[in-house]
């Protein structure tokens, strides 16, 4: 089993402390939510784990290795996959070419194995019918499926999803949830941050709630929903799944 941990993270911008002493853990085979009100520090925390923002204090560790100083591409080699909020698909490449663009970097695979892996992912994600479509021609839900399939092409241990429900048609939300659950069932650890609180809590097994730069609650969705401080600063009294 693999473990991804963030330990005592802190980040300031000039004199403003955005994140203070935040720690979290994601294990293989689980879905974890990182949530909180706007300006609470959740996105900065998420970006520190991804490698987009350098922490002032604390460290990021994967399977006992400190990766805090590694750039994103080296973190990817250690097993961290990342799906950004904005469209990351190569718009002028077909779906198949998008997958092969990542698989070509896999030195552990032969050319034949790369082609076979692309075919497997296309079948698994039910995107055979758009295999030869350009990225720019895909719907929001199709694009998300291709982007997640492409992230898996790198064979990650963990996948970090930034706003996976953003820009997705309501009819596709259940598809995205199923894909996220399938990622967990493959043995991956999944960390999600999203403004769509209801959908995120519905799919995750544990959640961390960030408030004013600190973790104010952690536990199952039911536990954090019933936390009085979380109700007061984030969810309100009437929130239900």
From Swiss-Prot:
Q: Which Pfam families match?
A: ABC_tran, BCA_ABC_TP_C
Record keywords: ATP-binding, Cell inner membrane, Cell membrane, Cytoplasm, Membrane, Nucleotide-binding, Translocase, Transport
Query: Which top EC class applies here?
Result: translocase
* Topology with respect to the bilayer: Peripheral membrane protein
Subcellular location as annotated: Cytoplasm; Cell inner membrane
Cleaved signal peptide residues: none
One CC-aspect GO term: plasma membrane
- Annotated residues that bind ATP are located at 36-43
Which GO BP annotation is one of this protein's?
Answer: transmembrane transport
- What Gene3D superfamilies does UniProt report for this protein, alphabetically? P-loop containing nucleotide triphosphate hydrolases (3.40.50.300)
**Stretches assigned to the ABC transporter domain:** 4-237
Q: Which GO terms describe its molecular function?
A: ATP binding; ATP hydrolysis activity
EC number in record: 7.5.2.-
Residue stretches in coiled coil? none
Q: Which InterPro entries match?
A: AAA+_ATPase (IPR003593), ABC_AA/LPS_Transport (IPR051120), ABC_transporter-like_ATP-bd (IPR003439), ABC_transporter-like_CS (IPR017871), BCA_ABC_TP_C (IPR032823), LPS_export_LptB (IPR030921), P-loop_NTPase (IPR027417)
Q: What does this protein do?
A: Part of the ABC transporter complex LptBFG involved in the translocation of lipopolysaccharide (LPS) from the inner membrane to the outer membrane. Probably responsible for energy coupling to the transport system.
Q: Which NCBIfam families match?
A: LPS_export_lptB, PRK10895.1
Its assembly, as annotated, is: Component of the lipopolysaccharide transport and assembly complex. The LptBFG transporter is composed of two ATP-binding proteins (LptB) and two transmembrane proteins (LptF and LptG).
Protein family membership: Belongs to the ABC transporter superfamily. Outer membrane lipopolysaccharide export (TC 1.B.42) family.
Q: What is this protein called?
A: Lipopolysaccharide export system ATP-binding protein LptB
List the source organism: Haemophilus influenzae (strain ATCC 51907 / DSM 11121 / KW20 / Rd)
């Amino acid at each position: 089993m693999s473990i991804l941990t963030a330990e005592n993270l802190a980040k300031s911008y000039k004199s403003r402390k955005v994140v203070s002493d935040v720690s979290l853990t994601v294990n293989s085979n689980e879905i974890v939510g990182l949530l909180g009100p706007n300006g609470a520090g959740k996105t900065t925390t998420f970006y520190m784990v991804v490698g987009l923002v350098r922490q002032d204090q604390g460290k990021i560790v994967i399977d006992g290795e400190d990766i805090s100083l590694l750039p994103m591409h080296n973190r990817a080699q250690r097993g961290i996959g990342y799906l950004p909020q904005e469209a990351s698909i190569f718009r002028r490449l077909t779906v198949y070419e998008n997958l092969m663009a990542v698989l070509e970097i896999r030195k552990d695979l032969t050319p034949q194995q790369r082609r076979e892996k692309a075919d497997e992912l296309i079948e698994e994600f039910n995107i055979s019918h758009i295999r030869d479509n350009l990225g720019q021609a895909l719907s929001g839900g199709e694009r998300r499926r291709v982007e997640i399939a492409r992230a898996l092409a790198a064979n990650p241990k963990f996948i970090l999803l930034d706003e996976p429900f953003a820009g997705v048609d309501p009819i596709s939300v259940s598809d995205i949830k199923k894909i996220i659950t399938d990622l967990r069932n493959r043995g991956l650890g999944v960390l999600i941050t999203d403004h769509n609180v209801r959908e995120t809590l519905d799919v995750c097994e544990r959640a961390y709630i960030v408030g004013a730069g600190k973790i104010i609650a952690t536990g199952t969705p039911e536990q954090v929903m019933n936390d009085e401080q979380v109700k007061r600063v984030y969810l309100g009294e009437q929130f239900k799944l």
